[in-house]
C-alpha cells in the first residue's frame, strides 16, 4: 500500500500541507505515477520545505509563489554538497515543478522562478542487458527448484519474469495485468497502460504464454476476472518487492552481477531484439517509449557490446598502426 509523505510531516502552513496532500493524491490516482515515484516526489518536497525553513523563509504558499531563482539554486547547491547525485537533483526539480503546476491549476499563483532554473546535466547511463542464456534462465522455475518455496510461487515468479524478458514489460505493467486479460490460449496480445497513460499493444510469444499457463494451473488462490493475475502467498496483489527478492535469489544461483535486476530483463528484451535486426521504431512501440531517442540508447548498447567483443578477440584491436 502506498505510503506517501503525510501532510503533518511537511513543514509549513496548513494550506500548504493540504495542497501537498492533494497533489500527491492526484499523482497517484489521476496521473497513475508509480508508488516509488509518488513517495520520492513527496520526499523531495519535504526536503525543499525544510531547506526554506532553515534559510529563514516561511514555507507557505505565498512564499513559494514569491521564490527567486537564487532560492532554488541554493537548494540544489546544498543538496549537491550533501553528495546527492545529479539524477536525484533532476528528479527533485521535476517534483517541485509538478507541485508548482498543481498550485497554479488550483489558483494559488505561478512559481515563475522554476522556469528560470535549468535541470542539472546528467550523463545517461547505458542499460546493462543480460546474456541471452542468463535472461532465459531467469525466467525458468527450474533454476530455483531447490528453494523451500511452494511450486506455484516459483511458477508465478517465472511467469512474471517471462513477461519482462519475453514482452518487454515494466514490472508494474506485468503486475497490473488482470486475470481476464491473462495471455493464455487464444489471447496472444496484451493491452498495456504504461507511463503517461499511454496505451500500447504488446504481442506475447508462445513460451511466455506457456509460463503464464503453468502458473495458472498450480495457483491455489481464486482469481476473480477483474482481480490481479499475479497474487502473493495470501492471495492479495503481488508486491514488486517480492519479484525483486526473487531476482536477487536468481542472481546468486546464476552468478550474475547486481545489475541483473527485473528492469534489466526489459533492457535485455530490447537489446536482443535489436541484435537480431529488429526495427528501432517497432521496438519503441513495444517498449512504450514516448521518444525514439530513449530507444536509441539500445543502439549504443549493441555497438558497445560489439566493440568490446572486437577488442577482446582481435590481436591488433586498439593498437597504434592497427
Curated annotation (Swiss-Prot):
Residue intervals of the Core-binding (CB) domain: 14-104
Pfam families given in the database record: Phage_int_SAM_1, Phage_integrase
Gene Ontology biological process terms, A to Z: cell division; chromosome segregation; DNA transposition
Active site: 170, 195, 263, 266, 289, 298 (o-(3'-phospho-dna)-tyrosine intermediate)
Domain of life of the source: Bacteria
Coiled coil: none
One Gene Ontology molecular-function label: tyrosine-based site-specific recombinase activity
Keywords: Cell cycle, Cell division, Chromosome partition, Cytoplasm, DNA integration, DNA recombination, DNA-binding
Keyword Cell cycle applies: yes
InterPro entries xrefs: CB (IPR044068), DNA_brk_join_enz (IPR011010), Integrase-like_cat_sf (IPR013762), Integrase_catalytic (IPR002104), Integrase_recombinase_N (IPR010998), Integrase_SAM-like_N (IPR004107), Tyrosine_recombinase_XerC/XerD (IPR023009), Tyrosine_recombinase_XerCD (IPR050090)
Family label: Belongs to the 'phage' integrase family. XerC subfamily.
Function: Site-specific tyrosine recombinase, which acts by catalyzing the cutting and rejoining of the recombining DNA molecules. The XerC-XerD complex is essential to convert dimers of the bacterial chromosome into monomers to permit their segregation at cell division. It also contributes to the segregational stability of plasmids.
Name of the protein in question: Tyrosine recombinase XerC
Organism for this UniProt entry: Methylobacterium nodulans (strain LMG 21967 / CNCM I-2342 / ORS 2060)
Amino acid at each position: 500500500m502506498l505510503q506517501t509523505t503525510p501532510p503533518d510531516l511537511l513543514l509549513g502552513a496548513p494550506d500548504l500541507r493540504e495542497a501537498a496532500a492533494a497533489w500527491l493524491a492526484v499523482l497517484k490516482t489521476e496521473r497513475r505515477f508509480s508508488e516509488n515515484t509518488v513517495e520520492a516526489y513527496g520526499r523531495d518536497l519535504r526536503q525543499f520545505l525544510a531547506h526554506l525553513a532553515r534559510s529563514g523563509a516561511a514555507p507557505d504558499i505565498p512564499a513559494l509563489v514569491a521564490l527567486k531563482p537564487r532560492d532554488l539554486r541554493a537548494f540544489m547547491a546544498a543538496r549537491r554538497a550533501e553528495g546527492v547525485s545529479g539524477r536525484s537533483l533532476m528528479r527533485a526539480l521535476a517534483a517541485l515543478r509538478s507541485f508548482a503546476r498543481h498550485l497554479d491549476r488550483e489558483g494559488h499563483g505561478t512559481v515563475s522562478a522554476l522556469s528560470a532554473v535549468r535541470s542539472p546535466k546528467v550523463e545517461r547511463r547505458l542499460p546493462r542487458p543480460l546474456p541471452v542464456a542468463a535472461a532465459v534462465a531467469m525466467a525458468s522455475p527450474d533454476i530455483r527448484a531447490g528453494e523451500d518455496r511452494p511450486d506455484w510461487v516459483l511458477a508465478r515468479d517465472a511467469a512474471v519474469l517471462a513477461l519482462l524478458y519475453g514482452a518487454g514489460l515494466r514490472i508494474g505493467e506485468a503486475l497490473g495485468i488482470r486475470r481476464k486479460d491473462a495471455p493464455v490460449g487464444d489471447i496472444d496480445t496484451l493491452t498495456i497502460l504504461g507511463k503517461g497513460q499511454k496505451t500500447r499493444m504488446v504481442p506475447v510469444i508462445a513460451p511466455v504464454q506457456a509460463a503464464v499457463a503453468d502458473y495458472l494451473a498450480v495457483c491455489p488462490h481464486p482469481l476473480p476476472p477483474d482481480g490481479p493475475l499475479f497474487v502473493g502467498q495470501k492471495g492479495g496483489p503481488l508486491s514488486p518487492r517480492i519479484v525483486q527478492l526473487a531476482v536477487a535469489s536468481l542472481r546468486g544461483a546464476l552468478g550474475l552481477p547486481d545489475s541483473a535486476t527485473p528492469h534489466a530483463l526489459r533492457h535485455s528484451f530490447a537489446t536482443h531484439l535489436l541484435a537480431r535486426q529488429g526495427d528501432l521504431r517497432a521496438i519503441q512501440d513495444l517498449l512504450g517509449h514516448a521518444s525514439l531517442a530513449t530507444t536509441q540508447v539500445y543502439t549504443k548498447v549493441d555497438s558497445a557490446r560489439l566493440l568490446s567483443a572486437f577488442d577482446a578477440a582481435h590481436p591488433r584491436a586498439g593498437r597504434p598502426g592497427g
